[in-house]
Swiss-Prot record:
The keyword Phosphoprotein does not apply. InterPro entries: ADH-like_C, ADH-like_N, GroES-like_sf, NAD(P)-bd_dom_sf, PKS_ER, Trans-enoyl_RdTase-like. PANTHER family: HYPOTHETICAL OXIDOREDUCTASE (EUROFUNG), TRANS-ENOYL REDUCTASE APDC. This is Trans-enoyl reductase grgB. Belongs to the zinc-containing alcohol dehydrogenase family. Keywords: NADP, Nucleotide-binding, Oxidoreductase. The keyword NADP applies. The gene is grgB. One of its GO terms (molecular function) is nucleotide binding. Residues 10-346 form the Enoyl reductase (ER) domain.
């Protein structure tokens, strides 16, 4: 096995650069070293190097591959196992953590064994959307819904055709809730195929009011996967007159937040699921949270079962070849909005 690798790391001037001869990290207690076969790209990967760059740190979150080494105390996995995992790259606290490399570290309890009928390109798209949707729906400061016993109550997912949106729709269905979504009419069939009970056109100025009518003024819970001023206003209009909870994936506009005192509004970072705290600029920093790590362990154990019994599906994929060398271009395509209703995936092994 080699001792060095290629990796995409934070550049001193911002953005990423392709680095040669990067030391392959050593798995510590509770972690595994994975030879990366494929990675998925997420908006976080493009944004983070602009607002909280960590030069020299490995980039990326979503990956899948084969286990090459296991750290002390690891019992779930062995060398040769096919796994998917999520990590949080561009991490100033630990620059060896990141997915955009030929080898990547994963935490044993924030990883899943891949079903035999799953390819690596499919599997690598699961981790971050699972972590994000799971935290948003089931944990504070998210909606804090029950993993079981939803009793059919409607929950709105704004951005139902995003990767987090389709995952959230599936998780809500399994927990007994009735997911309704906003999306473009062109994506109605896509969202319905993941379990959306109703789709509303976010282009319509009456979108929020229409949802409020259709839910009989009773909507209490909203997950906003888009998170801008327009979608936040729409979500506020949709929530019933008794108030409710709104959770976002980005910082939220206070100009909208305080227009309704009966709505609890907050936002979160999926990075917090690792429990180690988050060192980022401004309001993005997070204190350590063992409770969130315990939830992450529970969630990924469940996710492994759901994958193997077919309860959840991955988001539609767009595969770009070229390996690590093509990653800056792929990230730029995503940043410019050239990818719609698909998860961008790049095969690594063999490129």
């Amino acid at each position: 096995m080699p001792t060095t690798m290629q990796a995409l790391v934070g550049a001193e001037s911002g953005g990423y650069r392709l680095a040669e001869n990067v030391d392959i990290p050593v798995p510590q207690r509770g972690s595994i070293l994975v030879q990366v076969h494929a990675v998925a790209l997420n908006p976080r990967d493009a944004k983070i190097v602009d607002f909280s760059n960590a030069p020299g740190s490995l980039g990326g979150c979503d990956f899948a591959g084969t286990v090459k080494k296991v750290g002390e105390g690891v019992t779930r996995f062995k060398e040769g196992d096919r796994v998917l995992a999520v990590t949080f790259g561009s991490n100033a606290l630990d620059k060896t953590k990141g997915a955009f490399a030929e080898f990547a570290l994963a935490e044993e309890d924030i990883s899943c064994r891949i079903p035999e009928d799953f390819s690596f390109t499919q599997a690598c798209s699961i981790g971050l959307s699972m972590a994000t949707a799971g935290l948003a729906i089931f944990q504070a400061p998210g909606l804090e819904l029950s993993l079981h016993g939803g009793k059919g109550e409607a929950v709105l997912v704004s951005g139902g055709a995003t990767a987090t949106g389709t995952m959230a729709t599936q998780l809500l269905r399994m927990a007994g809730y009735t997911p309704i979504v906003t999306c473009s009419p062109a994506n109605n069939a896509l969202c319905q195929s993941y379990g959306a009970a109703a789709c509303f056109d976010y282009h319509s100025p009456a979108c929020g009011a229409d949802i409020r009518v259709q839910t009989n003024d009773s909507l209490r819970y909203v997950l906003d996967c888009v998170t801008d001023t327009t979608t936040m206003k729409m979500c506020y209009e949709a929530i019933g007159s008794s108030g409710g909870s709104y959770i976002a994936l980005e910082t939220i506009a206070t100009t909208v937040k305080y227009t309704r005192r009966d709505v609890r509004a907050d936002w979160f970072l999926a990075d917090a699921i690792m429990g180690n705290g988050v060192q980022m600029a401004g309001t993005y920093g997070r204190a350590p949270s063992p409770e969130l790590r315990r939830f992450g362990k529970q969630l990924f154990a469940l996710a492994e079962n759901w994958l193997h019994d077919g309860s959840i599906r991955h988001h539609p994929l767009e595969i770009q070849d070229g390996g690590l060398a093509n990653m800056p271009q792929a990230l730029n395509d995503m940043k410019l909005g050239k990818v719609h209703a698909k998860k961008l995936v790049v095969p690594i092994l063999g490129h």
